[in-house]
From Swiss-Prot:
Xref: CDD domains: ICL_PEPM
Biological process terms in GO annotation: propionate catabolic process, 2-methylcitrate cycle
Name listed for the protein in its UniProt record: Probable 2-methylisocitrate lyase 2
Taxon lineage: Bacteria, Bacillati, Actinomycetota, Actinomycetes, Mycobacteriales
Domain of life: Bacteria
Organism field: Corynebacterium glutamicum (strain ATCC 13032 / DSM 20300 / JCM 1318 / BCRC 11384 / CCUG 27702 / LMG 3730 / NBRC 12168 / NCIMB 10025 / NRRL B-2784 / 534)
Gene: prpB2
Annotated binding of Mg(2+), by residue: 92, 94
Length: 307
């Protein structure tokens, strides 16, 4: 479990854990955290990793996912999330916030944030949501330079660099596969196959590419929602649920606000709320209180560390 003010597991160890999860026969499941507290809940629920979605970072700022967020904003939220969990954190780094030199700087900043890895995509800059029409991709040569620059800048060899290709919806799946092979040759540790349609598409990609693959199970998009077990059986190594928790939370928020606006009282929602005691458990309130009591009653003669 994380320390009070930072994870008890060093960043390099969490990066090793992510690589081990990608090499395991079981698929690594990584829900998207819309806040540090959500990341802690993900860990307690028994998942293998935490995902930081660019769309969620943007939505939290009431912005659309069209490349408006900055590296500073994404790195800040990533650092906040990585601080509170012992799980590996994978971050959506969009296009790397520019061209190859910017992609290199992105990796440096995210390493400093303590996350386990990031993915860079082959859309033009600024990008748009991968499940919207009208997106464009850069040439394979440009994306290869992005990946190579990121790999070259990486200081910790355990840090995972994933290449996302959006080409399936633009140029077709065969082109996306050829791009994925080129990205792997450039040093990518994993391929994120965005906006595939059916199990057959996932199977075709798995048969053609021999490095770890990541599936995106996002709602209301172009991809059929598939069980983690089916993806594991196909041979995928990781699956993300990028906006799932935010959509659940905001759906409940809007319903509750509507009811309170109409009735003037929240009693119908009390049984559906997270109880105060459960919130305190997630916040580790008692551990902070014990720490505070130790400091408050501190004396040099009687001091006995409790951690």
């Amino acid at each position: 479990m994380a320390g009070l003010f930072s994870s008890a597991v060093a960043p390099t160890e969490r990066r090793k854990a992510l690589r081990a999860a990608l090499a395991a026969p079981e698929i690594a499941r990584m829900p998207g955290a819309f806040s540090p507290l959500a990341a802690r809940a993900i860990q307690e629920a028994g998942f293998e990793g935490v995902y930081v979605s660019g769309a969620v970072v943007a939505a939290d700022l009431a912005l659309p996912d069209i490349g408006l967020t900055t590296l500073t904003e994404v790195a800040h939220r990533s650092r906040q999330i990585a601080r509170v969990t012992d799980l590996p954190v994978l971050v959506d780094a969009d296009t790397g916030f520019g061209e190859p030199m910017s992609a290199a700087r992105t990796v440096s900043e995210l390493e400093d944030a303590g996350v386990a890895g990031c993915h860079l995509e082959d859309q033009v800059n600024p990008k748009r949501c991968g499940h919207l029409d009208g997106k464009e991709v850069v040439g394979t040569d440009i994306m290869v330079r992005r990946i190579a620059a990121a790999v070259n800048e990486r200081r910790d060899e355990q840090f995972v660099i994933c290449a996302r290709t959006d080409a399936a919806g633009v140029e077709g799946i065969d082109s996306a596969i050829e791009r994925a092979k080129a990205y792997a040759d450039a040093g990518a540790d994993m391929i994120f196959t965005e906006a595939l349609y059916s199990p057959a598409d996932f199977e075709k990609f798995r048969a053609a590419v021999d490095i770890p693959l990541l599936a995106n199970m996002t709602e209301f998009g172009k991809t059929e929602l598939l069980p983690a077990q089916l993806l594991e059986d196909i041979g995928y190594n990781a699956v993300i649920y990028p906006v799932t928790l935010l959509r659940i939370a905001m759906g409940q928020v809007e319903q509750a606000l509507g009811d309170i606006a109409n009735t003037g009282i929240q009693t119908d929602w009390v049984d559906r709320m997270q109880h105060r005691s459960r919130l305190y458990e997630l916040l580790r309130y008692n551990e902070y209180n014990a720490f505070d009591q130790q400091v408050f009653t501190y004396s040099a003669d009687s001091y006995k560390p409790i951690f």
